């Protein structure tokens, strides 16, 4: 009977054996746990998306840089305070562009007590406690103006690494693009993380000045490369575009 029912459904829905096998590979009966959970950056939603594998069920949208009405994030006093801590120059910024989440580590292995996520549009890092999937802290980088370096950590989560993407003047004043090589700069910030408290310690964090290249992703070494950190860069020629003059646009013209 089961075979005949399956054959009937396949015929009614015009499904091949390959289609049915694909569905069976992702199906999880109610009450059965997924083998894996994925923590994915939500991009310009400003959130973190959590879903299961193989079921692909969405478990939660973790509110991070943007209010989430259905879970009350950004509406109670505690989460309002977290969002306000991400204000820049006194202005509340309740949106973000999340990129490259990373788990906390011990001895270079993921332990997953905490998740870190950066905001590419605004230079911020958020800390998410994975005991309850709640954002507990947002810190603003006072040096850089954008980031894309991910939020990867040193092997025992002593530091969270944040790197600028686009170079900008450190003095926050306007400078013409002709001063790019002389005035514009990038930076890599190492945020000190207090593992027991689950919070970034801003006062014990520091930044290193970088040339005005474009930085991409950063990570800390492990094993033989322990003690080193690595950041890949492009545009070492410090090209500044000029599409209005018939030159290639910024990233298309960079090496």
What function would you assign to each model-found segment?
Residues 25-35, 100-102, 112, 162-184, ...:
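Short, conserved, GDST-rich strand-edge loop motifs in beta-rich repeat architectures
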Residues 41-86, 117-142, 181-183, 193-201:
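Beta-propeller domains
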Residues 19-28, 68-76, 85, 91-107, ...:
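Repeated scaffold domains used in trafficking and secretory/extracellular systems
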């Amino acid at each position: 009977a089961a075979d005949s029912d399956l054959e009937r459904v396949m015929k009614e829905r015009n499904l091949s054996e390959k289609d049915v096998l694909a569905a069976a590979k992702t199906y999880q009966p109610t009450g059965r746990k997924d083998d894996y959970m994925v923590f994915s950056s939500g991009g310009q939603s400003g959130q973190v998306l959590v879903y299961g594998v193989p079921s692909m069920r969405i478990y939660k949208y973790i509110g991070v840089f943007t209010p989430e009405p259905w879970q009350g994030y950004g509406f109670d006093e505690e989460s309002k305070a977290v969002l306000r801590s991400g204000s820049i120059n006194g202005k509340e910024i309740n949106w973000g562009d999340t990129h490259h989440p990373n788990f906390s580590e011990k001895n270079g292995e993921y332990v997953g007590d905490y998740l870190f996520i950066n905001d590419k549009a605004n230079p911020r890092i958020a800390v998410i406690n994975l005991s309850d999937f709640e954002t507990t802290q947002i810190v603003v980088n006072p040096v850089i103006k954008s980031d894309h370096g991910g939020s990867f950590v040193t092997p025992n989560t002593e530091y969270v690494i944040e790197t600028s993407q686009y170079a900008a003047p450190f003095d926050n004043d306007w400078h013409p693009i002709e001063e790019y090589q002389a005035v514009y700069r990038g930076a890599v910030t190492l945020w000190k993380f207090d593992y027991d408290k689950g919070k970034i310690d801003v006062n014990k964090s520091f930044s290193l000045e970088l040339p005005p290249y474009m930085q991409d992703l950063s990570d800390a070494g492990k094993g033989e490369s322990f003690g080193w950190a690595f950041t890949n860069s492009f545009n070492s020629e410090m090209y500044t575009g000029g599409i209005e003059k018939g030159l290639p646009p910024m990233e298309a013209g960079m090496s």
